[in-house]
Amino acid sequence: PDHVVEGVVIPFGIFKDHMLQKMPGQEYSYWAYLQSIFSDEKKMLEDGIDPKDVECMTLQDLNFFRSQMEEIPLKDEFVKNLDNYFQKIFGRSIGNIPVFLRSDTNMEDLPQFTGAGLNLTLFNVLDRSKILDGIKKVWASPYTERSYQWRQQYLNNAEDVYPSILIIPSVNVDKSGVIITKGVSRGDEGDISISFSKGVGGAVEGQSAESYVMYQNGTSELISPGRETKFRTIPATGGSTFQYASLNRPTLTKEDLEALNEMAKKIVTQMDKVTGEQSAYDIELGIKDGKIWLFQVRPFVENSDANTSNYLKSLDPEFKEIYV
């Protein structure tokens, strides 16, 4: 608990409650319109219409629906309660503390979920209006093309996806990254893989991060050095800035590695007790002034199909990297 920030959760039910409002100028609700999109899709497929054409029409409808969701009115009672919880949990009102809005959906509870990052997360938002607008944008994010396409591969009822939002105060960490509690490169179940970069959002955003394997005997091996010469910081005024750093020193010290290794072992022990089974975990964390801050723990699921999906690859831009 000492390594986790306090937070406010906007649960699935708040999203559904807002979805039951009528759409502007219509007699039907947002929820009814969403259901009609997928029922029309099923009917067109049953009628023998080319699946590619059906998908194109569905994506057009979802694009319109997403634009409507981004403008959905927030209920006065909800905003009032949110104000109260900000004051109670954070000690400040909305607009006076920068926060992260982290998305979550009920499909992420599925054991085979491998779609981390499909939905929107907003970081270091300070302005009150941007926080409230951000809630709408996070609610709308499961209806992007990428998120829809992922759900179609795994869910029979892709329309029944409910987003929740975790609001946590921003921590301007010195370095951040991920831990996988198994040896990713060699597949050894007893090893721990660590990838870190300077600043916030390290390793999670696909950076060329500094990566290690921590072996069961306590020794470590550098798999790849960090190659990022700039890193993101999040000032108290909101938003983000970039700073530049030399590569003459490692991102993680020996003490960092030992502390991260110990933290990972404690998390595995605790999570295995909670779940009642032994698993590998994907852990997001950061380090600020030598203290580890834990941001997220989820089961680590390897998805070989996703790694070879031409569709998913086609949605990712190609970047050219030049190293000097």
Walk through the language-model features, giving the residues of each:
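Conserved divalent-metal-coordinating catalytic cores
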Residues: 1-2, 6, 10-19, 28-32, ...
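N-terminal beta-alpha lobe that positions the nucleotide/phosphoryl donor
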Residues: 1-166, 175, 252, 268-272
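Two-metal-ion RNase H-like nuclease active-site motif
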Residues: 165-168, 281
